[in-house]
UniProtKB/Swiss-Prot annotation:
Role, per record: Required for normal renal development and establishment of left-right axis. Probably acts as a molecular switch between different Wnt signaling pathways. Inhibits the canonical Wnt pathway by targeting cytoplasmic disheveled (DVL1) for degradation by the ubiquitin-proteasome. This suggests that it is required in renal development to oppose the repression of terminal differentiation of tubular epithelial cells by Wnt signaling. Involved in the organization of apical junctions in kidney cells together with NPHP1, NPHP4 and RPGRIP1L/NPHP8. Does not seem to be strictly required for ciliogenesis.
Name of the gene: Invs
UniProt protein name: Inversin
Residue ranges of domain IQ in the record: 555-584, 914-943
Domain comment quoted from the record: The D-box 1 (destruction box 1) mediates the interaction with APC2, and may act as a recognition signal for degradation via the ubiquitin-proteasome pathway.
Biological-process GO terms, alphabetical: animal organ development; embryonic heart tube left/right pattern formation; epithelial cilium movement involved in determination of left/right asymmetry; kidney development; negative regulation of canonical Wnt signaling pathway; pancreas development; post-embryonic development; protein localization to ciliary inversin compartment
Entry's localization field: Cytoplasm; Cytoplasm, Cytoskeleton; Membrane; Nucleus
Comp. bias regions, Polar residues: 636-658, 676-689, 713-724, 1046-1062
Length: 1062
């Protein structure tokens, strides 16, 4: 084939016809072109090549000679900076090289790789070209280095040309020059798999058989022996190790000797050779403590292992982690090596563990070699051996998901209920690896899918952490709970949201995972918070669509709930405080009422005494100066005793009736006796007893009251000679004497008890009553009654006179007061006695408190007044009167008595104001209780769910209307009664002002107008019959719905006027 066609077919482009003529060897055409255009002799194509170069490539010596004669440049370079001589040396064309060298070609010219024609000439087997170049080169130019710092000798060793090496060494080439990798020509000569490389090695070693040359290490620490062992060239290894200076145990940078490489590569013969020529007698180990036997066992070279085990210097030593070559072989699943070692070494411990507690079975289970596991189990390997992490081989298999190994171990007796040092079970490790099949196998072997480790994490959380959907599905299909929290409060949804596994989140929510579970730490993050922190936008959107909340939203909701609960607590607390306040006011009102009754009794006694002094001062003087003569008891008086029949006394029967005129005609009575007998009438009992007091209070005990008609029957014949004037004087003196005796005379037995005659020896002398008798009038002391019997004649006469006296409170029979007629000159107190309970309350304070005055409180008030008079320094009395006698108040100066009365009035006025406020509070409280009771009654009706509110409002309005009308009709109007004439308007205004001022001090606002608003009438019939309205005094009903408020409807008038009507 024509060369031009060959060049063109290969894609070369000739720049001109001169290149074509050079390639084709058309010498005539080439000369014509050059003659016609001399510049064409060095014309370059696109590769920078000249016609001369193409002549070299095409082996056109004639054309080349013609171009050289025409003046072509012999050292012209192409784009790779190569000349025609480089191309001739590369092709090994001796003729062209000789032609170009004779034309003064530059043999030191370097191309882009810095290679000279000398480097290129070493690749050919013939040394002629190399010898031609060496003839033209100086002695120092033979070691010219290329870009990799390699000389021609390096290339000769690399191409395994021993003749070239001898020729270069003969021209003084340096055999110890390292290249860029630190290799000398011996390294390149030993790095041959061809056994003929031994000649090049010998050629170099013969030139300089030094120890440094044999043990020269490159920059990776490898000697020529390392390269010879790596290539498995037994001949070169034999040559190298034949020198005594060769170091067989030399380490490279990986701390591996030539024996390690021979064992790793499985060169059994080289291993045997090296073991035999190892003069040290020890087997070196690498940086990990592994011996060549470890490498041979790991690489599954049974023959090599056999060579090692058969050598007496080899032992199965452990590496730095305590692992033997047997463990290495088990970890790699090298059953042949294991069988070889078990057969050759009978003392091998199959259960030997490394420093982490792992055995050969651990290594085999971790790698998943079922055959190796069976082999070890057949050789009595311990199936439940634990390492330092308390992992058994089954744990390793579950972690890596080796299903066959797991089943083999379970069949071999491995326990499935063990946990490691962190509390992880086999199911935890299977879930961490995402092995759904392994999880199913373990669950079938009765492992709880909700088992928790020491941190509280479940296998489901481990699977959610890795986003293993299949494993999560298997666990939840086997009743794994997705809402279990670990000790930090995280659930499986927390881990899935943290890592952004949307599919896992969907799966968890499908199995009823709670999306708002909070952590237990300080942040209290929810799964949505983890998604927000990780900026998982798709997860955030999906969680929000399924009702997920962040911790900030939950805190807002919790704050709202807490505020609502706190408001309810404050309302209940205010209710309890107001209730306690009202109960305290109620107790204060009761105390004030008791004190008021006591002061009222004192006031009445003082008014009676003042009235007596104003109406009859001379008579009081006479009665006080007249001697009291004892009168013997009369048989008629003894026989005229009658039993007073007790009965209920009217509420306002305190009017003092005039005595019967027949009393003045009693025989055997002198004026002194008459005044003395009449003076035992108790003024205090007349004025201060309760209006509603029953006859038992008047007549209980051994000394009950005697009806005044007993005087008419027994003493009418004895009082014939006595004038009416003397009788009146005696009666007035008797009244004065009773005032002097004070409260002691009020408690003296006046007449015989009801139902039995009085004893003749009964003592009638006045005595001071004890405190217990004053406080408990309904429990008379029998010992005092027996001790009060008469022991002398004077006492009997006194008792007889007391029997002839009428009862202070009057008899229960309507006709018992016929003989008693009030005198015209008696005190105004007896002329204006209150007629009813309401008028009496108006006289006291103008407030209907609903509590009647106590008789004992009145008596105690009178006694207090008596003690004040006796102890006053202004009266001049050093000591009180002796027991049985009373001091006459008329003996005191008028100014002193007025001062005492004024002081009592001021104190009672202050008490009256307090009592008014307490009465208003009591009325409000009773109103609230009544409304509450009515609301409870109305709710007991069995009505429909829709009609309950309307019917309740109608019934409540009707009841309130009826009740208010009954109260307005039946409440008696209070009449102000007093002995002194006062302005009604002034008294009522003062009372009203005192009432509102006290309430304003308590509540801070006026209570005017409360309970006086009309309620809209209803046409519904009455559902409750009000049997007794008068018994509920001072109670004004209001809207029953207001009872839920905590002010007990004590609202200011501005609010009460605007309240809605039913």
């Amino acid at each position: 084939m024509n060369i031009s066609e060959d060049v063109l077919s290969t894609g070369s482009s000739l720049a001109s016809q001169v290149h074509a003529a050079a390639v084709n060897g058309d010498k005539g055409a080439l000369q014509r072109l050059i003659v016609g255009n001399s510049a064409l002799r060095d014309k370059e194509d696109r590769f920078g090549r000249t016609p001369l170069m193409y002549c070299v490539l095409a082996d056109r010596v004639d054309c080349a000679d013609a171009l050289l004669k025409a003046g072509a440049d012999v050292n012209k370079t192409d784009h790779s900076r190569r000349t025609a001589l480089h191309l001739a040396a590369q092709k090994g064309n001796y003729r062209f090289m000789k032609l170009l060298l004779t034309r003064r070609a530059n043999w030191m010219q370097k191309d882009l790789e810095e290679m000279t024609p000398l480097h290129l000439s070493t690749r050919h087997r013939s040394p002629k070209c190399l010898a031609l170049l060496l003839k033209f080169m100086a002695p120092g130019e033979v070691d010219t280095q290329d870009k990799n710092k390699q000389t021609a000798l390096h290339w000769s060793a690399y191409y395994n040309n021993p003749e070239h090496a001898k020729l270069l060494i003969k021209h003084d080439s340096n055999i110890g020059i390292p290249d860029v990798e630190g290799k000398i020509p011996l390294h390149w000569a030993a790095n041959h798999k061809d056994p003929s490389a031994v000649h090049t090695v010998r050629c170099i070693l013969d030139a300089a058989p030094t120890e440094s040359l044999l043990n020269w290490q490159d920059y990776e620490g490898r000697t020529p022996l390392h390269f010879a062992v790596a290539d498995g060239n037994l001949t070169v290894v034999d040559v190298l190790t034949s020198y005594e200076s060769c170091n067989i145990t030399s380490y490279d940078n990986l701390f591996r000797t030539p024996l390690h490489w021979a064992a790793l590569l499985g060169h059994a013969q080289i291993v045997h050779l090296l073991l035999e020529r190892n003069k040290s007698g020890t087997i070196p180990s690498d940086s990990q403590g592994a011996t060549p036997l470890h490498y041979a066992a790991q690489s599954n070279f049974a023959e090599t292992v056999k060579v090692f085990l058969q050598h007496p210097s080899v032992k199965d030593d452990s590496d730095l982690e305590g692992r033997t070559s047997f463990m290495w072989a088990a970890g790699k699943g090298n059953d042949d090596v294991l069988r070889t070692m078990l057969s050759l070494k009978s003392d091998i411990d199959i259960n030997m563990s490394d420093k982490y507690g792992g055995t050969a079975l651990h290594a085999a289970a971790l790698s998943g070699h079922v055959s190796t596991v069976k082999l070890l189990l057949d050789n009595d390997a311990q199936v439940d051996a634990t390492d330092v992490m308390k992992h058994t081989p089954l744990f390793r298999a579950c972690e890596m998901g080796h299903r066959d190994v797991i089943q083999t171990l379970i069949k071999g007796g491995a326990r499935v209920d063990l946990v490691d040092q962190d509390g992880h079970s086999l199911l935890h490790w299977a879930a961490l690896g995402g092995n759904a099949d392994v999880c199913q196998i373990l669950i079938e072997n009765k492992i709880n899918p909700n088992v928790q480790d020491y941190a509280g994490r479940t296998p489901l959380q481990c699977a959610a952490y890795g986003g293993y959907i299949n494993c999560m599905a298997v666990l939840m299909e086997n009743n794994a709970d997705p809402n279990i929290q670990d000790k930090e409060g995280r659930t499986a949804l927390h881990w899935s949201c943290n890592n952004g596994y949307l599919d896992a989140i969907k799966l968890l929510l499908d199995f009823a995972a709670f999306p708002n579970q909070m952590e237990n730490n300080e942040e209290r993050y929810t799964p949505l918070d983890y998604a927000l922190l990780g900026e998982r936008h798709e997860v955030i959107q999906f969680m929000l669509e399924h009702g997920a909340l962040s911790i900030a939203a939950i805190q807002d909701i919790a704050a709202f709930k807490i505020q609502a609960v706190y408001k309810g607590y404050k309302v209940r607390k205010a209710f309890r405080d107001r209730k306690n306040l009202l109960m305290k006011h109620e107790q204060l009102r009761k105390d004030a009422a008791a004190k008021k009754r006591e002061e009222e009794n004192k006031r009445k006694e003082a008014e009676q005494q003042k009235g007596q002094l104003d109406t009859d001062p001379p008579r009081s003087h006479c009665s006080s100066s007249a001697p009291v003569l004892p009168c013997p008891p009369s048989p008629q008086n003894e026989g005229s005793k009658q039993d007073a029949t007790p009965s209920k006394q009217p509420p306002a029967s305190h009017t003092v009736q005039s005595p019967d005129p027949e009393h003045s005609r009693l025989p055997g009575r002198c004026p002194g006796r008459a005044s003395q007998g009449d003076s035992s009438i108790d003024l205090q009992g007349t004025a201060s007893r309760k209006p509603s007091e029953t006859p038992i209070e008047h007549c209980r005990g051994p000394s009950a009251c005697v009806h005044p008609r007993s005087w008419e029957g027994g003493n009418s014949s004895k009082n014939q000679g006595t004038s009416s004037v003397e009788k009146r004087r005696g009666e007035t003196n008797g009244k004065h004497r009773r005032c002097e005796e004070g409260p002691s005379s009020a408690r003296q037995p006046l007449c015989t008890g009801s139902g039995r005659p009085a004893e003749k020896g009964e003592d009638s002398s006045p005595a001071v009553a004890s405190a217990s008798q004053q406080d408990h009038p309904r429990k008379p002391n029998k010992r005092q009654d027996r001790a009060a019997r008469p022991r002398g004649a004077s006492q009997k006469r006194r008792t007889h006179q007391l029997r002839d006296r009428c009862s202070p409170a009057g008899s229960s029979r309507p006709g018992s007061a016929k003989g008693e007629v009030a005198c015209a000159d008696q005190s105004s107190l007896h002329r204006h006695t209150p007629r009813s309970k309401v008028t009496q309350d108006k006289l006291i304070g103008g407030v209907s408190s609903g509590l009647p005055l106590s008789t004992e409180a009145s008596r105690s008030g009178c006694k207090q007044l008596y003690e004040d008079i006796c102890a006053s320094p202004e009266t001049g009395v050093a000591h009180g009167p002796p027991p049985g006698q009373c001091m006459n108040i008329h003996l005191l100066p008028v100014e002193q008595r007025l001062l005492i009365i004024q002081r009592e009035r001021s104190r009672k006025e202050l008490f009256r104001r307090k009592n008014k406020a307490a009465a208003v509070i009591q009325r409000a409280w009773r109103s609230y209780q009544l409304r509450k009771h009515l609301s409870r009654l109305l709710h007991l009706k069995q009505l429909g769910a829709r009609e309950v509110l309307r019917c309740t409002q109608v019934c409540t309005a009707l009841l309130l209307q009826v009740w208010r009308k009954e109260l307005e009709l039946k409440f008696p109007k209070s009449i102000s009664v007093s002995r002194t004439s006062k302005s009604p308007s002034k008294g009522s205004s003062a009372t009203k002002y005192a009432r509102h001022s006290v309430l304003r001090q308590i509540y801070g606002c006026s209570q005017e107008g409360k309970g006086h608003h009309p309620i809209k009438s209803s046409k519904a019939p009455a559902v409750l019959h009000l049997s007794s309205v008068n018994s509920l005094q001072s109670i004004h009903l209001d809207n029953s719905g207001r009872s839920k408020k905590f002010s007990y409807n004590l609202q200011p008038s501005s609010q009460s006027k605007n309240k809605p009507k039913l």
